[in-house]
Amino acid sequence: MTTRPTPATGLFAAALLATCGMLQASPAKAASQDALPAPVQVPAGHKVAWETVGTGDITYECRAKADAKDQVEWVFAGPKAVLKDRQGKQVGTYYGPPATWEAADGSKLTGTQVAVAPAGAGNLPYQLVKANPAMGAGALTGVAYIQRTALKGGVAPQTPCTKAGQRSQVSYQADYIFWKAD
């Protein structure tokens, strides 16, 4: 048995081809800062150079309060995280102190905090860091700012600490966006 195309089949095929012709790869969308608080927005004249997702732990240590030496509290001691690209491939690490971002290619940098802003209950704050010049050539060369966004977790434990020197690790996740000058 032989089947023959009908006029409706021809119209469907023409419409399908026309639709396929309109589907083009769209250019990569620039990271938008519109939803971020003004203090942690990167100044104009910069563009996104690298986007990573950091997952790891924040370590807190029980230390004497500055204004009450007979009392103790949780104090930020440092981060340790794996940095992955948007496809899930490990591309670096983040650790401290001092806060250090290190790419898999060996380039690394430190920075100075410029601003923070609340990122919701139970989450570390948004953060804007001014990068120091990178050590070693690679992905981090020329980075001017690092932005911490899309935060999940990482705040100090809710249970009070009881003994100086006690440590606790809290898991967190954040996007680290690296910006270079235009």
Model-derived segments and spans:
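Bacterial N-terminal signal peptides that target proteins for export
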Residues: 2-13
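Intrinsically disordered, low-complexity segments enriched in proline/serine/threonine
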Residues: 7-9, 29, 45
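Bacterial N-terminal signal peptides
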Residues: 12-21
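Sec/Tat signal peptide C-region and signal peptidase I cleavage site
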Residues: 23-30
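Primary mode marks residue(s) on the alpha4-beta5-alpha5 output face of response regulator receiver
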Residues: 31-59, 66-182
